[in-house]
């Protein structure tokens, strides 16, 4: 495939004869550029600080009062109980997913903090955390951590299509939501 297509000299002469006397047209058209969307790039230090700030609320010693019967669920005091019902029914579709499989507790805390910070930054209301079954360490700890965070409105065991009892759907408070 290294063969180049070469015109015979007679063809080149014919072409030059045909274009003899032509003039180059001046460029007189204005090219309009489409306006670009402003992409906000957050500095890495800011993202790391948000992650640290969000994971600040998680303590391993604190034991919130969570429901022991039925599926894992939590509703922040003063929040609308109908939101929890909509979570249970699967009315909310999570926009962000976090998979904690294979993570240590420390890294899982940091990742959950980063997820909550990202939800607030991107104005995402519903997210899904997949903690898995495993040795039940993250399955037990994740709800305890989430119940401590002030930006979590509610969480409920996910419906089967989002992970069933190996995942949690959570509602994150945003500035947009607080104004409603």
From Swiss-Prot:
Domain Smr intervals = 98-173
State the UniProt keywords alphabetically: Endonuclease, Hydrolase, Nuclease, RNA-binding, rRNA-binding
In the record, what terms sit under GO molecular function? RNA endonuclease activity; rRNA binding
**Principal EC category:** hydrolase
Could you describe the subunit structure of this protein? Associates with collided ribosomes, but not with correctly translating polysomes.
The identity of this protein, by name, is Ribosome rescue factor SmrB
UniProt-listed Enzyme Commission number(s): 3.1.-.-
**Family note:** Belongs to the SmrB family.
Question: Which Pfam family would be a valid example here?
Answer: Smr
Which BP terms does GO give this entry? rescue of stalled ribosome
| InterPro entries the UniProt entry points to | Smr_dom (IPR002625), Smr_dom_sf (IPR036063), SmrB-like (IPR022990)
What does the UniProt function comment say about this protein?
Acts as a ribosome collision sensor. Detects stalled/collided disomes (pairs of ribosomes where the leading ribosome is stalled and a second ribosome has collided with it) and endonucleolytically cleaves mRNA at the 5' boundary of the stalled ribosome. Stalled/collided disomes form a new interface (primarily via the 30S subunits) that binds SmrB. Cleaved mRNA becomes available for tmRNA ligation, leading to ribosomal subunit dissociation and rescue of stalled ribosomes.
Instruction: Name the encoding gene, please.
Output: smrB
**Superkingdom classification of source:** Bacteria
